Amino acid sequence: MELYYLTAHELSDLLNRKEISSEEATAAIIDRIEAVDGRVQAYLTRTAEQALEEARAVDAARARGETLGPLAGVPMALKDNLCTEGVRTTCSSRMLADWVPPYDATVVRRLKEAGAVMLGKLNMDEFAMGSSTENSSFFPTRNPWDLERVPGGSSGGAVAAVAAGEAYFALGSDTGGSIRQPASFCGVVGMKPTYGRVSRYGLVAFASSLDQIGPITRDVTDCALVLEAIAGHDPLDSTSADLPVPDYRSALKPEVKGLKIGVPREYFGAGMEPEVAAIVRRAIAKLEELGAVCEETSLPHTEYALPAYYLVAPAEASSNLARYDGVSYGLRVPGKDIIEMYMNTRSQGFGPEVKRRIMLGTYALSSGYYDAYYLKALKVRTLIRRDFETAFEKYDLLATPTSPTVAFRLGEKAGDPLAMYLSDLCTIPINMAGLPALSLPCGFSQGLPVGLQLIGRPFAEATLLQAAYAFEQSTEYHRRRPELGVA
């Protein structure tokens, strides 16, 4: 297999045995980016020279016999809503097209401490609002498995980069499925940790009660490795949980015997492509074959998750995005007075989907409609959380499709926001409940990847990783790579 298609842990083993240098691995990835990113369009900002300098520094430290971090010398990339000191961070928006943060996000700092090498910043839907990466203000990213299809979103650039061999791993953010849905579309592993497991400090906020940062990797072992590096309490984020970080790699045993897995029938309803449903059911049967006990169950309020989410998330976005006014930082479009300057800046700085959600959120929070919409959505959110609590009294995990479909064609849903929102039908309830969930490849339909979603109890990421690892070790889907020849 080509060097750029190795997993992070495979590369790390080669580096530790000194069979290859970090500079060589980084140069190979930079060459790969040069060869294919003109078609995939995953990167917004490349930091090739900085990456090579960081790689040389790791090689020098290794030569001196210094103790190195678990990701030392491994090249990675970041979704462009994670603050990076001295490196442009745009959120794929005109509003922040030239913004350079003065500090690193906590997860970025932790990756640096672990020794990882940063290749650049990755395309996304503007302010993480979208399911296809077509809402980027710069350009759409393409799915490496079929360049006429979307990679999913909003972390489409991050997932496409990992799938295409343009980074060994990436970090994304997940507010309603933005790591898991594109991971399903592009055939990689994507995890949304429990809300509070990973610090949000330095993540440009979309919906603060739903956002969570997580790893995007080529296999489950890499997922465990990266999660362990970024997880843990952070005094700079009051919502981060003050709990010890487990040794996630020690949970990676190919053993699910006796594990009880619930299969919610509501996740196989209308809108589900029959072949996707069949592939996911075969994956669940494989877990059963490996010794898990799988039973059908019910999460009765699932059908209300999507409408409730599209009140809660836009309401929080309306508040969070009020800060972009042209005064302190970011885009400023002049006007005859400050009111006109605000209007010009926000109308020209935000794209159509962001404006749509700000309008919806502002409406839901307005005095005449707050009780009827926003407050009711919060009550529904409580019912959704209670459904999961009831299910987890009986089951260790839940298993569902990650997405009701395979990757759709570029432009296919761009003019139909409701059709686009339905892409996250299977992922949104997990964010509403604050639970951990993971998508991993479980098959192919029409030559396109399909994802299995595993959902766990709060802070039970180790159990998720164990079950995912057991499935992965008994199949070969995670070893398949898209055939992206060099143009």
Swiss-Prot record:
Keywords: ATP-binding, Ligase, Nucleotide-binding, Protein biosynthesis
Biological processes, Gene Ontology terms: translation
Catalytic-site annotation from UniProt: 79, 154, 178
Keyword Protein biosynthesis attributed: yes
Disulfide bonds: none
An annotated GO cellular component: glutamyl-tRNA(Gln) amidotransferase complex
Pfam families from the UniProt entry: Amidase (PF01425)
Keyword Ligase: yes
Catalytic reactions of this protein: L-glutamyl-tRNA(Gln) + L-glutamine + ATP + H2O = L-glutaminyl-tRNA(Gln) + L-glutamate + ADP + phosphate + H(+)
GO molecular function, one term: glutaminyl-tRNA synthase (glutamine-hydrolyzing) activity
InterPro entries, alphabetized: Amidase (IPR000120), Amidase_dom (IPR023631), AS_sf (IPR036928), GatA (IPR004412)
Its EC number(s): 6.3.5.7
Family membership: Belongs to the amidase family. GatA subfamily.
Subunit annotation: Heterotrimer of A, B and C subunits.
HAMAP family per record: GatA
Chain's role: Allows the formation of correctly charged Gln-tRNA(Gln) through the transamidation of misacylated Glu-tRNA(Gln) in organisms which lack glutaminyl-tRNA synthetase. The reaction takes place in the presence of glutamine and ATP through an activated gamma-phospho-Glu-tRNA(Gln).
NCBIfam families noted in UniProt: gatA
Full protein name: Glutamyl-tRNA(Gln) amidotransferase subunit A
Organism: Moorella thermoacetica (strain ATCC 39073 / JCM 9320)
